[in-house]
């Protein structure tokens, strides 16, 4: 049975892990969200999130955005190659509804997979 959990091993936790992704990454982006990724040696993808106060002022809005992105990653983790991924949220994402945000992030997962495989 396929597991759809989001355990600690699926997260980027340390500053060193985040920093490694910023050096020569594979990119997939839209106007509101950028995905940066590098191949990892694990048997699964890992996710790191950054939602700056500069773009999303209220904590509840930042938490909502992170929750939607984490949930999308959790459900699509088996379709994503073995990459360390950092999601950068930019201006304009706060006005998006959850369904619209989910649709955008799923499109970016596919775009990132194509760039990695192709």
Curated annotation (Swiss-Prot):
Pfam families: Ribonuclease_P (PF00825). One of its GO terms (cellular component) is ribonuclease P complex. The keyword Acyltransferase does not apply. Its EC number is 3.1.26.5. Keywords: Endonuclease, Hydrolase, Nuclease, RNA-binding, tRNA processing. GO terms for molecular function: 3'-tRNA processing endoribonuclease activity; ribonuclease P activity; tRNA binding. It catalyses: Endonucleolytic cleavage of RNA, removing 5'-extranucleotides from tRNA precursor. Gene3D superfamilies: 3.30.230.10. GO terms for biological process: tRNA 3'-end processing; tRNA 5'-leader removal. RNaseP catalyzes the removal of the 5'-leader sequence from pre-tRNA to produce the mature 5'-terminus. It can also cleave other RNA substrates such as 4.5S RNA. The protein component plays an auxiliary but essential role in vivo by binding to the 5'-leader sequence and broadening the substrate specificity of the ribozyme. PANTHER family: RIBONUCLEASE P PROTEIN COMPONENT. Belongs to the RnpA family. Consists of a catalytic RNA component (M1 or rnpB) and a protein subunit. This is Ribonuclease P protein component. It comes from Shewanella oneidensis (strain ATCC 700550 / JCM 31522 / CIP 106686 / LMG 19005 / NCIMB 14063 / MR-1). The gene is rnpA.
């Amino acid at each position: 049975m396929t597991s759809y959990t989001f355990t600690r091993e699926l997260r980027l936790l340390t500053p060193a892990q985040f920093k490694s992704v910023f050096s020569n990454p594979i990119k997939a982006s839209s106007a509101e969200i950028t995905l940066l990724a590098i191949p990892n040696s694990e048997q699964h993808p890992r996710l790191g999130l950054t939602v700056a106060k500069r773009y999303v002022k209220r904590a509840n809005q930042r938490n909502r955005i992170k929750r939607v992105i984490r949930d999308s990653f959790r459900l699509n983790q088996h379709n994503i190659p073995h990459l360390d991924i950092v999601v950068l949220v930019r201006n304009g994402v706060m006005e998006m509804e959850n369904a619209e945000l989910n649709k955008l992030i799923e499109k970016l997962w596919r775009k990132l997979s194509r760039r990695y495989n192709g």
